[in-house]
Amino acid sequence: MKAMILAAGRGSRMGDLTNVTPKPLTRISNTTLIEKNIKNIRKSGIKEIIINVSWLGDRIINHLGDGNKYDVNIYFSDEGKDMLGTGGGILNALDLLDKDPFWLVNADLFCDFSIDIKKTLTNGDLAHLVLVDNPEHHPDGDFLLKNGRVSVCKKKM
């Protein structure tokens, strides 16, 4: 199994902070957002990681290298200046992902997780989602759960 980290975005909501540093390289304590994700992915047993890049992508590529220092193999899907969005970024990286299920993570996710993803896809599941509680300012959220499974996905207005 492989993982893909979405790291091509501009990070515009962070204002001037991302003018010279891409959001995935934002430091929290002694690590960057993207390194935290790489370590969590590795801890879950996955060693092949594809990372899409665009905005300041060369800095991400230079910082992470081939993944050897994280005991993983990193392959980059460079979107150039186009920023293809989530779906376009995945589509652009399909040659690197093969046809097997893969783990998809946003580069700006910062949490501790360790999932045996190989055991979570059962009974014809198309995906396994890790969701977080809704913040107080958005109590309804985008998903509804029934018996621990996503049953409704609200459309964005």
Segments (PLM) and residue ranges:
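Residues at the C-termini of beta-strands that transition into short coil/loop
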Residues: 7, 29, 78-80, 131-132, ...
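Active-site metal-binding loops of divalent metal-dependent hydrolases
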Residues: 10, 107-109, 134
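Conserved core of the sugar-phosphate nucleotidyltransferase
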Residues: 111-157
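Short glycine-/acidic-enriched loop or helix-start segments at secondary-structure transitions
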Residues: 15-16, 37, 61-63, 87, ...
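Conserved beta-strand segments of alpha/beta enzyme cores
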Residues: 24, 73-75, 126
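Conserved N-terminal catalytic core of the sugar/cofactor nucleotidyltransferase
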Residues: 2-5, 31-106
